[in-house]
Curated annotation (Swiss-Prot):
Site (Transition state stabilizer): 19
Role this protein plays: Reversibly transfers an adenylyl group from ATP to 4'-phosphopantetheine, yielding dephospho-CoA (dPCoA) and pyrophosphate.
Annotated coiled-coil segments of the chain: none
GO cellular component, one term: cytoplasm
Subunit structure: Homohexamer.
Species per Swiss-Prot/TrEMBL record: Streptococcus pyogenes serotype M2 (strain MGAS10270)
Similarity field: Belongs to the bacterial CoaD family.
Catalytic reactions of this protein: (R)-4'-phosphopantetheine + ATP + H(+) = 3'-dephospho-CoA + diphosphate
The organism's place on the tree of life at top rank: Bacteria
Cofactor(s) needed: Mg(2+)
Keywords: ATP-binding, Coenzyme A biosynthesis, Cytoplasm, Magnesium, Nucleotide-binding, Nucleotidyltransferase, Transferase
Chain's gene name: coaD
Name of protein: Phosphopantetheine adenylyltransferase
One term of GO molecular function: ATP binding
Length: 163
């Protein structure tokens, strides 16, 4: 039987509970999942890559079929081919996400027609949540409870101690 391997990518700057919900749900659908931290060339990162990887790895520690990977200046579809991924996993919060993902899927399919894209719709609880909003809350030192995993809260507290 074919092993189903998924790749869920994002900048995870920082990882949110919405991201974790997608991973949790996908982990039951796939034999193995790679969670890939990619830099978005159109955005300046708030957290350094190694910090994002540490927060994400800690947040996903209980998942036995999930591996965190990073990539610099490469297309996710190229990394997917290298990892022998069978499916790309994408989370959709709203129509704007869908339009973006629809365009991305078109090009991914051109580059790797054998890799399918699977979309998981965000639960209502997480549809308004984004890393951008979390960064805004961090800037104003607002509570992050119920929005991000403890690894992110601990990192933010550590950063606040230094200032």
């Amino acid at each position: 039987m074919l092993t189903k391997i998924g790749l869920y990518t994002g900048s995870f700057d920082p990882v949110t509970n919405g991201h974790l919900d997608i991973v949790k749900r996908a982990s039951g659908l796939f034999d193995q999942i790679y969670v890939g931290i990619f830099d978005n060339p159109t955005k300046k990162s708030y957290f350094k890559l190694e910090v994002r990887k540490a927060m994400l790895t800690q947040a996903l520690a209980d998942f036995t079929n999930v591996i965190v990977v990073t990539s610099h200046e490469r297309l996710a579809i190229d990394v997917a081919k290298e990892l022998r991924v069978t499916h790309l996993i994408r989370g959709l919060r709203n129509a704007t996400d869908f339009e973006y993902e629809e365009n991305l899927e078109y090009f991914n399919h051109l580059l790797a027609p054998n890799i399918e894209t699977v979309y998981l719709i965000s639960r209502n609880k997480w549809q308004a949540l984004s890393s951008s909003r979390v960064r805004e809350l961090i800037h104003f030192q607002s509570s992050l409870e119920d929005l991000v995993p403890q690894s992110v809260i601990a990192q933010v507290e550590k950063m606040n101690e230094k200032t």
